[in-house]
């Protein structure tokens, strides 16, 4: 769904473990890393989209996570001109995103990047909470910063609780 201003409605997903680290995934066949995200389909709510994308991209079901927070407002970024598909109608100039902070409640081995027939990611790892803000592609940085700033109090409270057996090493599934 692209709005009148040219922004595609989308959700962003931040999954954290009990150590306050976040799930960071590498785009399939590329060198870029990002959080899971995906477009809202006609008739879907942001929460329904989040669960659909979570399953399609990461292989996790609603019972594998707990929603901790949702951004109060839509966060927007514009695409660089080189990524705007001219000739498509309507023209999408960027994304407007509702972000979800989730707590992983299952074993990390339940992550399955190959769940769909067309994987979005080919590798993943746990990283420190603020790492993605510095390391995502430049045109997404401000949205990441705003989402993470809003989620920080909740995520930091979670990481101050005793760990529940979560490992913090890199996990590869492909």
From Swiss-Prot:
> In which residues does the motif Nudix box occur?
38-59
Needed cofactors: a divalent metal cation
GO molecular function annotations of the record: mRNA 5'-diphosphatase activity
Q: What Enzyme Commission number(s) does the record list for this chain? A: 3.6.1.-
Q: Name one GO biological process term.
A: mRNA catabolic process
Q: What Pfam families does UniProt report for this protein, alphabetically? A: NUDIX
Cross-referenced InterPro entries:
Nudix_hydrolase, NUDIX_hydrolase-like_dom_sf, NUDIX_hydrolase_CS, NUDIX_hydrolase_dom, RppH
The terms describing its cellular component in GO are: cytoplasm
**Domain spans labelled Nudix hydrolase:** 6-149
Superkingdom of origin? Bacteria
Enzyme class of the recorded protein, top EC level: hydrolase
**SUPFAM superfamilies named in the record:** Nudix
Keywords, sorted A to Z: Hydrolase
Family to which this protein belongs? Belongs to the Nudix hydrolase family. RppH subfamily.
Q: What does this protein do?
A: Accelerates the degradation of transcripts by removing pyrophosphate from the 5'-end of triphosphorylated RNA, leading to a more labile monophosphorylated state that can stimulate subsequent ribonuclease cleavage.
UniProt-listed NCBIfam families: PRK00714.1-1, PRK00714.1-4, PRK00714.1-5
Q: What is this protein called?
A: RNA pyrophosphohydrolase
Name of the gene encoding the protein in the UniProt record: rppH
